[in-house]
Design a protein with these regions (language model features):
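Surface-exposed loop/turn motifs in large extracellular/passenger domains
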Residues: 10-18, 32-38, 50-58, 71-80, ...
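Short, T/G/N/S-enriched strand-turn elements that build extracellular solenoid repeat scaffolds
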Residues: 3-9, 23-29, 42-49, 63-69, ...
Length: 172
């Protein structure tokens, strides 16, 4: 599906199943629930938005300088490899399951609720100029084999980190 520099605007709930989605500089949005499944997603400088729950399943997603967000509900992501460099992922609650997350200068944020990351390898910045932010309005739950961070990891309430290898040079 090619939505490069385009607009797909659903007035109701919207399901999109495609092999490949090019949403580079595009806008894919739903006034209700958005359910997106694709092997590869290019959301570079694009927007994937839902007023209600946003569910995204993908093997590879490039969200460089892009936005993936739900205004009034949750974002549930199952992505094998996520590039969120200078990108933003936000919702009331955010859940991410995957194998690799690169979050250089990116932000993943639950506005008022929980941020749950179950990712094998998390890179939240490897230098001060590439520091990312993982921010939970309430509870932060991270389960990972490896977590490298020069960025901010913040919980408004409790933080539960289950990590086998931690390199943290930023704020925790």
């Amino acid at each position: 599906t090619d939505n490069q520099k385009g607009l797909i605007d659903a007035l109701e709930s919207f399901d999109l199943n495609t092999q490949q989605l090019n949403n580079n500089q595009g806008r894919l949005q739903s006034t209700k629930t958005l359910n997106l499944s694709s092997n590869q997603i290019d959301n570079s400088t694009g927007h994937i938005l839902a007023n209600d729950t946003l569910i995204l399943n993908s093997e590879q997603t490039n969200n460089t300088e892009g936005v993936i967000a739900s205004v009034n509900a949750d974002v549930q992501l199952k992505i094998t490899a996520l590039e969120n460099n200078k990108g933003e992922i936000s919702a009331q609650n955010v859940q991410l399951n995957g194998q690799t997350l690169n979050n250089h200068q990116g932000t993943i944020q639950s506005k008022v609720g929980d941020l749950t990351l179950k990712v094998d390898r998390i890179d939240n910045g490897n230098a001060q100029d590439s520091a990312g932010s993982l921010v939970a309005g309430k509870n932060l739950n991270i389960t990972a084999q490896q977590l490298n961070s020069t960025g901010q990891i913040y919980a408004g309430d409790t933080a539960d980190l289950t990590v086998k290898q931690l390199q943290q040079d930023g704020q925790l």
